[in-house]
Amino acid sequence: KRSSRDIGTRINQIIPEGEFVGNLNDLPKARFNFVPHREVGLMTAVYLDEEFGMPCISTTPAGIIDTAECIRQMQERVGKWASAPPKEKVDHEPYIDQHTRSV
């Protein structure tokens, strides 16, 4: 949650954390699905990709390398949807550098 907030990504829903069945209608509004634990939720994320074309990030942000890769994948997914000109797009490499040095 913290990394998503820090890089400016708004979380649509966290399933099943405090969600209700009625909120499932909002799932297709997400730009991508983030599945930090492949054993929980990956099948659903694959289904949403097949049905709604919603890509999935399943890199577990644990350790320096995978945390950096996960953030880069988020940046790439958000960048594909961003309407800002390329010169205004956000570069998260300084954030990645700062947080992987302090681990």
From Swiss-Prot:
Enzyme class, spelled out: oxidoreductase
Segments crossing the lipid bilayer: none
Q: Where is the composition biased (Basic and acidic residues)?
A: 86-103
What is its subcellular localisation? Answer: Plastid, Chloroplast
- The EC number(s) given in the record are 1.3.7.7
Per its UniProt record, the required cofactor names are:
[4Fe-4S] cluster
Q: Give the metabolic or biological pathway.
A: Porphyrin-containing compound metabolism; chlorophyll biosynthesis (light-independent)
Q: Which Gene3D superfamilies does this entry report, sorted A to Z?
A: Nitrogenase molybdenum iron protein domain
Where does the source fall among the domains of life? Answer: Eukaryota
- What InterPro entries does UniProt report for this protein, alphabetically? ChlB/BchB/BchZ, Nase/OxRdtase_comp1
GO cellular component terms, alphabetically, are: chloroplast
Question: What Pfam families does the record tag this protein with?
Answer: Oxidored_nitro
- State any GO BP term from the record: photosynthesis
Per the record's keyword annotation, is Transferase included, yes or no?
A: no
Instruction: Print the keywords alphabetically.
Output: 4Fe-4S, ATP-binding, Chlorophyll biosynthesis, Chloroplast, Iron, Iron-sulfur, Metal-binding, Nucleotide-binding, Oxidoreductase, Photosynthesis, Plastid
Binding note for cofactor: Binds 1 [4Fe-4S] cluster per heterodimer. The cluster is bound at the heterodimer interface by residues from both subunits.
Reactions it catalyzes: chlorophyllide a + oxidized 2[4Fe-4S]-[ferredoxin] + 2 ADP + 2 phosphate = protochlorophyllide a + reduced 2[4Fe-4S]-[ferredoxin] + 2 ATP + 2 H2O
Q: Which GO terms describe its molecular function?
A: 4 iron, 4 sulfur cluster binding; ATP binding; metal ion binding; oxidoreductase activity
List every stretch annotated Disordered.
81-103
Record note on quaternary structure: Protochlorophyllide reductase is composed of three subunits; ChlL, ChlN and ChlB. Forms a heterotetramer of two ChlB and two ChlN subunits.
Chain's role: Component of the dark-operative protochlorophyllide reductase (DPOR) that uses Mg-ATP and reduced ferredoxin to reduce ring D of protochlorophyllide (Pchlide) to form chlorophyllide a (Chlide). This reaction is light-independent. The NB-protein (ChlN-ChlB) is the catalytic component of the complex.
Family, per the entry? Answer: Belongs to the ChlB/BchB/BchZ family.
The record ties this protein, via PANTHER family, to: LIGHT-INDEPENDENT PROTOCHLOROPHYLLIDE REDUCTASE SUBUNIT B
The protein's name: Light-independent protochlorophyllide reductase subunit B
The organism's taxonomic lineage, starting at the top: Eukaryota, Viridiplantae, Streptophyta, Embryophyta, Tracheophyta
Query: Gene encoding it?
Result: chlB
